[in-house]
Amino acid sequence: MIRILGEGKGSKLLENLKEKLEEIVKKEIGDVHVNVILVSEDEIKELNQQFRGQDRPTDVLTFPLMEEDVYGEIYVCPLIVEENAREFNNTFEKELLEVVIHGILHLAGYDHEFEDKNSKEMFEKQKKYVEEVWGEWRSNPSEDSDPGKR
């Protein structure tokens, strides 16, 4: 199960995609609870400094907790996601989907910073999942998915 915490840009889209994201979690990790938490630029910068020693904001950070009630948490900064979307000539919605799936794969044990083989497999899976979910969502967007609130 996925819980979307935090409000603002992206929260409605993630709620609309929750079922598909839960399928990925179940396939990659199992029947576990994952929190996706939308945070400000200052909050993600503080977390990045505290846990990675990087004094800058980032788009996504993943923390495996492996507790009984929550397996892990994925922190996402919509502002940085939006900046990256512009930089990579992507839509905000697709970039948001990419970072959340990226976080899910990190929770599943994939690592792209230290293992080349694992990195290749991770990004191949990420691309496959993004295309599957994005394609389905684009062909059947929910009636209540207001682009201004996604």
UniProtKB/Swiss-Prot annotation:
Keyword entries, A-Z: Cytoplasm, Endonuclease, Hydrolase, Metal-binding, Nuclease, Ribosome biogenesis, rRNA processing, Zinc
Top-level EC class: hydrolase
Pfam families attached to this UniProt entry: YbeY (PF02130)
Cofactor binding mode and count: Binds 1 zinc ion.
Claim: Iron is one of the keywords in the record: no
EC code: 3.1.-.-
Subcellular location(s) per record: Cytoplasm
Keyword Nucleus: no
Cofactor(s) essential for the protein: Zn(2+)
InterPro entries per record: MetalPrtase_cat_dom_sf_prd (IPR023091), YbeY (IPR002036), YbeY_CS (IPR020549)
PROSITE patterns to which the protein is assigned, alphabetical: UPF0054 (PS01306)
Residues where Zn(2+) binds: 102, 106, 112
Molecular function in Gene Ontology: metalloendopeptidase activity; RNA endonuclease activity; zinc ion binding
One cellular component term from this protein's GO annotations in UniProt: cytoplasm
One of the protein's GO biological processes: rRNA processing
Family: Belongs to the endoribonuclease YbeY family.
UniProt xrefs under HAMAP family: Endoribonucl_YbeY (MF_00009)
Protein name from the UniProt record: Endoribonuclease YbeY
Organism: Thermotoga maritima (strain ATCC 43589 / DSM 3109 / JCM 10099 / NBRC 100826 / MSB8)
